[in-house]
Amino acid sequence: MRTPLVVGNWKMNGSRAANRALLESMRKEMEAGVTAEVAVCPPFVYLADMESLLQGSVINWGAQNLSHHEVGAYTGEIAPSMLADLGCRFVIVGHSERRTLYGETDSLVAEKAIVAQKVNIIPIICVGETLQEREQNITEQVVKRQLNAVLELAGVNALEKAVIAYEPIWAIGTGRTATPEQAQEVHALIRSHVAIQNSGIAEELLILYGGSVKGNNAAELLAMPDIDGGLIGGASLDAKEFLTICQAAG
């Protein structure tokens, strides 16, 4: 049985004072009872604070990105081992903002996922289509192509210690949300595509939904059989809203 996972992606938001207030409030709220696994992904500069702020809590933490290089002369980059030093359990790779704003390719995303696993960090591999691609009815081709980059580089066994996040790009930060049925259709597609190579891994694979998830739509989305949690953006910056989503997950 899959344990639901809810991950808060803070993006480029926060300050030391704001983070402390948010996490203190979040910790208190979580004590009310949440059975889903929960994690937050703050900006790099705040990762070192997470251990002290979250010590003794049920909340894990992770990073929003990493280098595909393991060490070396790469100014401004963050090595996987550095994230491991800071206690990261997860790292987001291939978020649509990284793909669209910074030109990250499918192959680069796959490389990042694999180097994360080398230091026992679980990559959250993001896939999803643009509005234009959806209107052209090529969602299936796009998502399979993105998944295949990982499968071809490392094989299906790499997904034993990975999470997939489906984020329809047209629903991120736009206020638009895929209907539960639209989201479920793509989640089922992802699981069935992996199952072609290994049905056991496919059955255990966590597939999160990310795309304007809020407290008022989380229950419907997370009730779908192949949606195992959420990758939450803006709503993760509000403790009560985030708690509502976590409770809806399990």
UniProtKB/Swiss-Prot annotation:
Pathways per UniProt: Carbohydrate biosynthesis; gluconeogenesis; Carbohydrate degradation; glycolysis; D-glyceraldehyde 3-phosphate from glycerone phosphate: step 1/1
UniProt xrefs under InterPro entries: Aldolase_TIM, TIM_sf, TrioseP_Isoase_bac/euk, Triosephosphate_isomerase, Triosephosphate_isomerase_AS
Active-site residues annotated for this sequence: 95, 167
Keywords for the protein's UniProt record, in alphabetical order: Cytoplasm, Gluconeogenesis, Glycolysis, Isomerase
GO CC terms in record: cytosol
GO biological processes: gluconeogenesis; glyceraldehyde-3-phosphate biosynthetic process; glycerol catabolic process; glycolytic process
Residues that, per the record, bind substrate: 9-11, 173, 212, 233-234
Cross-referenced PROSITE patterns: TIM_1, TIM_2
Function statement: Involved in the gluconeogenesis. Catalyzes stereospecifically the conversion of dihydroxyacetone phosphate (DHAP) to D-glyceraldehyde-3-phosphate (G3P).
Similarity comment: Belongs to the triosephosphate isomerase family.
Protein name, entry field: Triosephosphate isomerase
